[in-house]
Amino acid sequence: MRLAIINGEFKDKISIFDRGLAYGDGFFETTAWRFSKRKKDCRVEFWNRHLRRIKQTCQFLNIKISNFSQLEKDKKKILTKAHNIGMVEGVLKIIITRGEGGRGYKYEKNMKPNIMFIVSNKTEYPSDFYSNGVKIKISKSSITINNSLAGFKHLNRLDSVLARSEWEDHDVFDSMFIDNYNNIIEGTMSNLFFIKENVLHTPSINVCGIKGIMREVVIDKCSEFFDEIKICESSKDFFLEADSIFLTNSLIKILPVKQVESKKFVIDQRVLKIIKKFDDLKFLELK
């Protein structure tokens, strides 16, 4: 099941002249939503954090959205429709492009952005992924170094597309990028955390990678389980000496890792406690 709204209207086609198609000139957000029985409406997990990042990315890319309250209206409109046709939870993807324009990289001032909301079914991961962990690999593909774009979820995702084409093994959940300096960065679709001697480490996202919302949530709300949370460069060798590893994104939340290539890892009980936090609706900052 999929629904789409473009600029406030239910439709699923855009112009071939859209700069998002021609140049990747735009960005996207992906998050989860659910129907709240208590509130009697549909709510998005960590919505205010996603909305803040939308505003920050618009400012950085100089994409002019005149009225951000329209995003709230579009969100409500598409989720209400989704619930009316029987959905009680799912995935919400928001794509914002600079809009339609002529040839060439230079964009016109005051272009009208195209704002797309897409609702689709939630992917159900096996419960043993969360109790027993998943396998991951190290990518053979490089990740693009770009200090200016680091952290932003822009539409140029060919790094992940090429890396994801490297494996067909259904037992492998994701593949980790290594930069040109042999530092571990992130997965094709996830951020990365690892525990070493009671310290939680996550790679810095200063020259490449995405600063994911779930990465932010763990840093902000899970410090109680560790002596320290370090955001720093981490070599591949240092990472492979970790005591325990987990992945994050807005759909999987927290996913323990049991194996990297041929090396096996234990699942720290603190990771399981963090997973339990997501059962608390207040923790999800629903809005």
Where are these regions (language model features)?
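Ordered, amphipathic secondary-structure segments that act as subunit-interaction surfaces
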Residues: 79-96, 103
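Helix-start/capping segments and mature chain N-termini
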Residues: 1-66, 73-77, 102-287
